[in-house]
Amino acid sequence: LVSKYCDHLPLYRQSGIYARSGVELDRSTLAGWVDQADQLLDPLVAALGRYTLAAAKIHADDTPVPVLQPGRGQTKTGRLWVCVRDDRPIGSSDPPAAWYQYTPDRKGEHPQRHLRQYRGILQADAYGGWGKLYGSGQITEAACWAHARRPWWDLYLSSGRDGTSIAAQALGRIAELYAIERDIRGQPPDVRQAQRQARAGPLLQEMHAWLSQLLGRVSAKSELAQAIGYSLTRWQALTRYCDDGRIEMDNNAAERALRGVALGRGNYLFMGSDAGGERAAAIYSLVQTAKLN
């Protein structure tokens, strides 16, 4: 399990490694062991999920995974979703945790089902499937400044890294906000909130006015307008962190939790079935939680 889900070694490679040492273990035998181990770990994974969703704030994200369609010789695109509980940035001693779920597609009904009992703050990207969760009034939306920054970075690169460009100015403003976060990392929520309101609040007001002014001067179909629009249409969710010290500026905690999935995806190419995706989600939950601790 560790070799496959932590070291990203597919079972056929593990079988080859054992064979070089004179131990004949067929890949199907190893797959059976993975399945049996997963069944034994189910109660622990369920408890981990309950613990993760007991947090006042969680980070969530998803990533595509190719899944073999039995009998068709083709793959489809499943999804691995992750919810991360990590309050170390606010000085909490509560252990961090990551809980993964697999689904055969990206329909919004899946995260809505996973989080139907959750009550608290959900920090995530702009995926539309989260919308009904926020509409219930039981989950508070917190958006991600890393996502808001990306279109500006792309524009900056396309300008040839022109330091005088509008994109460079936007990146500079966002960098000022992140500098404040570095100063207050590990502080309790009330201290973070006070510092943000005093230092980030005025910067955010200036940025909103600047973006609004720019939007009126550029073509509505331009990439610049899209970058501006991304931030302005999500402004309340993007700036909610300023008034709540528990919230982070971005959703990087969830994105980091999916890096291992991306590495594994590059090595074992696809999952053998939907059941294999569910097994992967369970074991990734334990592996990533162990890494966080």
Segments (PLM) and residue ranges:
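Catalytic center-proximal scaffold of phosphoryl-transfer enzymes
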Residues: 1-293
